[in-house]
Amino acid sequence: MRALFLLALGSIPALVSGQLSGSVGPLTSASTKGATKTCNILSYGAVADNSTDVGPAITSAWAACKSGGLVYIPSGNYALNTWVTLTGGSATAIQLDGIIYRTGTASGNMIAVTDTTDFELFSSTSKGAVQGFGYVYHAEGTYGARILRLTDVTHFSVHDVILVDAPAFHFTMDTCSDGEVYNMAIRGGNEGGLDGIDVWGSNIWVHDVEVTNKDECVTVKSPANNILVESIYCNWSGGCAMGSLGADTDVTDIVYRNVYTWSSNQMYMIKSNGGSGTVSNVLLENFIGHGNAYSLDIDGYWSSMTAVAGDGVQLNNITVKNWKGTEANGATRPPIRVVCSDTAPCTDLTLEDIAIWTESGSSELYLCRSAYGSGYCLKDSSSHTSYTTTSTVTAAPSGYSATTMAADLATAFGLTASIPIPTIPTSFYPGLTPYSALAG
């Protein structure tokens, strides 16, 4: 339970001072829920033998405790052969201290929580985990189930748990509100379609999370408002993003702050191709990157998605500031790449204190198209007519040098062998400790 009005709003520009619209997290503590009623899955048929299907036991324990209580999954190894859909909870929690191993082969969601309020999923030891064994699918060029999906969940938190090797996406928050996600490690295979965290909804704080994969690190989708994402470690990932954005996009009041990105697709991307609607009031602040394919990549003609009918998604009032580090090859992929729709130009953009230098060669490019505002290759004009400009930079920008993280991976995890369960880091951004100490 956190009253996040106490965040230092004075340090945030006025355009995004309302990034959170109220308090986030569960309304009742896990200890209070446990004191009301505790439903130990061992009492409902679970056996920690990594063989007996734990799905029915979790479902039964939830039914007994969903109206007020705590579902307890003790330490030990459990096999999940049938997926669990947990619905209609109120003032309930799941304490995951054991490790759940996927043995089932169905599609869908291994663990789904829906239509629930005042909810908490956590490990008291920071060692609770779900191992998806996605490599079994990926080695054959296929995908399977997603690990965790929350749908229409309000006043919630997910923390101190580990998600590993999802057959598809790792963690999705679908139309959720007033939530907090923190102190997590997510580790997946090195290919697309294995998203780390996808979130759409309202008033959600995601912080102190490490993601390894090759797709979304922490990504906001539409519709979304008042989302705060900070202290994120994209450690050989796809990188953080917004989108993809299509018809009737509605995204506003989004803050990403203190994001460290290593050997990823990009430091941040906003991706669309046609479509309609708006993205407004966005702050991308304090980013460090090394070894990434792209750095800032706003692409209104993103070729990896099929074009959507419409003039394009209108981006307005976007601020990018205090970015440092290096990029793999800034001459082939501009560190500043702002490509907006000619028929829906970006307006009121601010690029400030961006210092990214190429790791290969001695020059890099900045590219802007139909993008208006201040800084670098943006045009400052009220006409908002289409244009494209490319500038060549031949000297390293002042202040680009930035620290690395000791836990930066030397190589990605492959697709043909089991990915080990990691420990949750004690830092997710250089020089910062988590807002909340790890549990246990």
Curated annotation (Swiss-Prot):
<protein>
    <recommendedName>
        <fullName>Rhamnogalacturonase A</fullName>
        <ecNumber>3.2.1.171</ecNumber>
    </recommendedName>
</protein>
<feature type="glycosylation site" description="O-linked (Man) threonine">
    <location>
        <position position="404"/>
    </location>
</feature>
<comment type="function">
    <text>Pectinolytic enzymes consist of four classes of enzymes: pectine lyase, polygalacturonase, pectin methylesterase and rhamnogalacturonase. Has a positive effect in the apple hot-mash liquefaction process. Hydrolyzes alpha-D-galacturonopyranosyl-(1,2)-alpha-L-rhamnopyranosyl linkages in the backbone of the hairy regions of pectins.</text>
</comment>
<feature type="glycosylation site" description="O-linked (Man) threonine">
    <location>
        <position position="394"/>
    </location>
</feature>
<feature type="glycosylation site" description="N-linked (GlcNAc...) asparagine">
    <location>
        <position position="50"/>
    </location>
</feature>
<feature type="glycosylation site" description="O-linked (Man) threonine">
    <location>
        <position position="416"/>
    </location>
</feature>
<keyword id="KW-0326">Glycosidase</keyword>
<feature type="active site" description="Proton donor">
    <location>
        <position position="215"/>
    </location>
</feature>
<dbReference type="InterPro" id="IPR012334">
    <property type="entry name" value="Pectin_lyas_fold"/>
</dbReference>
<feature type="glycosylation site" description="O-linked (Man) serine">
    <location>
        <position position="386"/>
    </location>
</feature>
<keyword id="KW-1015">Disulfide bond</keyword>
<feature type="glycosylation site" description="O-linked (Man) threonine">
    <location>
        <position position="403"/>
    </location>
</feature>
<feature type="glycosylation site" description="O-linked (Man) threonine">
    <location>
        <position position="426"/>
    </location>
</feature>
<keyword id="KW-0325">Glycoprotein</keyword>
<keyword id="KW-0378">Hydrolase</keyword>
<feature type="glycosylation site" description="O-linked (Man) threonine">
    <location>
        <position position="389"/>
    </location>
</feature>
<feature type="glycosylation site" description="O-linked (Man) serine">
    <location>
        <position position="427"/>
    </location>
</feature>
<feature type="disulfide bond">
    <location>
        <begin position="217"/>
        <end position="234"/>
    </location>
</feature>
<feature type="glycosylation site" description="N-linked (GlcNAc...) asparagine">
    <location>
        <position position="317"/>
    </location>
</feature>
<feature type="disulfide bond">
    <location>
        <begin position="39"/>
        <end position="65"/>
    </location>
</feature>
<feature type="glycosylation site" description="O-linked (Man) threonine">
    <location>
        <position position="423"/>
    </location>
</feature>
<comment type="similarity">
    <text>Belongs to the glycosyl hydrolase 28 family.</text>
</comment>
<feature type="signal peptide">
    <location>
        <begin position="1"/>
        <end position="18"/>
    </location>
</feature>
<feature type="glycosylation site" description="O-linked (Man) threonine">
    <location>
        <position position="392"/>
    </location>
</feature>
<dbReference type="InterPro" id="IPR000743">
    <property type="entry name" value="Glyco_hydro_28"/>
</dbReference>
<dbReference type="GO" id="GO:0005576">
    <property type="term" value="C:extracellular region"/>
</dbReference>
<feature type="glycosylation site" description="O-linked (Man) threonine">
    <location>
        <position position="385"/>
    </location>
</feature>
<keyword id="KW-0119">Carbohydrate metabolism</keyword>
<feature type="disulfide bond">
    <location>
        <begin position="368"/>
        <end position="377"/>
    </location>
</feature>
<dbReference type="GO" id="GO:0000272">
    <property type="term" value="P:polysaccharide catabolic process"/>
</dbReference>
<feature type="active site">
    <location>
        <position position="290"/>
    </location>
</feature>
<dbReference type="GO" id="GO:0004650">
    <property type="term" value="F:polygalacturonase activity"/>
</dbReference>
<feature type="glycosylation site" description="O-linked (Man) threonine">
    <location>
        <position position="390"/>
    </location>
</feature>
<keyword id="KW-0624">Polysaccharide degradation</keyword>
<feature type="glycosylation site" description="O-linked (Man) serine">
    <location>
        <position position="401"/>
    </location>
</feature>
<dbReference type="InterPro" id="IPR011050">
    <property type="entry name" value="Pectin_lyase_fold/virulence"/>
</dbReference>
<dbReference type="Pfam" id="PF00295">
    <property type="entry name" value="Glyco_hydro_28"/>
</dbReference>
<dbReference type="GO" id="GO:0046576">
    <property type="term" value="F:rhamnogalacturonan alpha-L-rhamnopyranosyl-(1-&gt;4)-alpha-D-galactopyranosyluronide lyase activity"/>
</dbReference>
<feature type="glycosylation site" description="O-linked (Man) serine">
    <location>
        <position position="418"/>
    </location>
</feature>
<keyword id="KW-0732">Signal</keyword>
<keyword id="KW-0961">Cell wall biogenesis/degradation</keyword>
<feature type="glycosylation site" description="O-linked (Man) serine">
    <location>
        <position position="436"/>
    </location>
</feature>
